[in-house]
């Protein structure tokens, strides 16, 4: 999915050439097993990758699991591929598996230009909550809460560590764990009533156009510089590249854009199945195939 010039079809064609040039794969490679940790961006990229693989005669499957369970599944050779290693925020979680030689990170990121940090509605930003250091001043309005995503996520761990270590004076705050959809619903409810809320925001995601919101400055030491600027990498189970070289070549060529992902994520958040959302996007964007 290299989109500026290369395309899905070109990527697929490269894979077809690879299939002719490389020795036949293990029959088990036909069943490519993806992990999805319940994030709409990963559902979108996994959906697009699955559409390409299906067109090449593969039978991709998806397992929904938390991040630790997904990595454990790769360690145990129950999962082959995960398209959502957000670096650097997920590094503490994945590093033990990499050091143990159980997971391989592909060299080229599948997405650049992502970001990942705390955010607030624009009206709250305009009132003065613009920086991590401002959060404590708004404790009463916020109800002493910071809204995160699913339990076990590295983002929640970062927020919890801030609270535990009293970073930015947050020792009296509480992390509210939820799902992506649950957290966004809470943020949207707060927006309709113009209540104060601090929540986890990221891009790519439709929230950036669906809500008037601002990312908080000052969190470089927690989420990373430039509002948690991130690269997203593809990871595979150790040995997968050698066992399934044709699929591996395709995975090495998968690259997405923030705009593309956001367009596919929108329908997914409206309950459209990821593969269907991916197919619809590709049909509506024929230039993708050129």
Describe the residue ranges of each PLM region:
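Pocket-flanking alpha-helical
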Residues: 46, 63-101, 182-186, 206-212
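A bilobed periplasmic-binding-protein/Venus flytrap-type ligand-binding module shared by bacterial periplasmic
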Residues: 115-125, 229-243
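C-terminal functional modules
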Residues: 111, 254-290
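Ligand-binding pocket segment of bilobal, Venus flytrap-like solute-binding proteins
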Residues: 79-84, 151-220
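Ligand-binding cleft/hinge of the Venus flytrap
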Residues: 48-57, 139-173, 280-284
């Amino acid at each position: 999915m290299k989109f500026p010039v290369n395309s899905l079809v070109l990527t697929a064609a490269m894979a077809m050439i690879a299939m002719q040039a490389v020795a036949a794969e293990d029959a088990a490679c036909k069943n490519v097993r993806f992990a999805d940790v319940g994030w709409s961006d990963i559902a979108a990229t996994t959906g697009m990758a699955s559409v390409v693989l299906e067109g090449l005669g593969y039978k991709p499957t998806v397992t929904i699991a938390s991040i630790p369970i997904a990595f454990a599944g790769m360690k145990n050779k129950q999962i082959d591929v995960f398209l959502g290693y957000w670096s650097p925020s997920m590094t503490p979680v994945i590093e033990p598996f990499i050091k143990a030689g159980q997971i391989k990170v592909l060299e080229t990121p599948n997405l650049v230009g992502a970001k990942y940090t705390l955010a607030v509605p624009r009206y709250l930003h305009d009132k003065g909550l613009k920086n991590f250091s401002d959060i404590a001043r708004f404790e009463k309005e916020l109800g002493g809460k910071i809204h995160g995503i699913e339990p076990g996520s590295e983002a929640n761990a970062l927020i919890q560590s801030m609270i535990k270590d009293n970073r930015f004076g947050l020792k009296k705050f509480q992390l509210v764990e939820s799902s992506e959809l649950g957290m966004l619903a809470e943020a949207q409810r707060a927006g309709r009533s113009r209540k104060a809320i601090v929540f986890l925001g990221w891009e790519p995601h439709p929230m950036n156009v669906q809500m008037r919101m601002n990312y908080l400055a000052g969190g470089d030491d927690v989420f990373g510089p430039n509002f948690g600027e991130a690269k997203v990498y593809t990871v595979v189970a150790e040995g997968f590249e050698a066992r399934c070289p044709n699929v591996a070549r395709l995975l090495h060529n998968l690259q997405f854009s923030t705009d593309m992902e956001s367009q596919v994520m929108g329908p997914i958040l409206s309950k459209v199945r990821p593969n269907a959302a991916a197919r619809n996007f590709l049909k509506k964007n024929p230039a993708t195939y050129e």
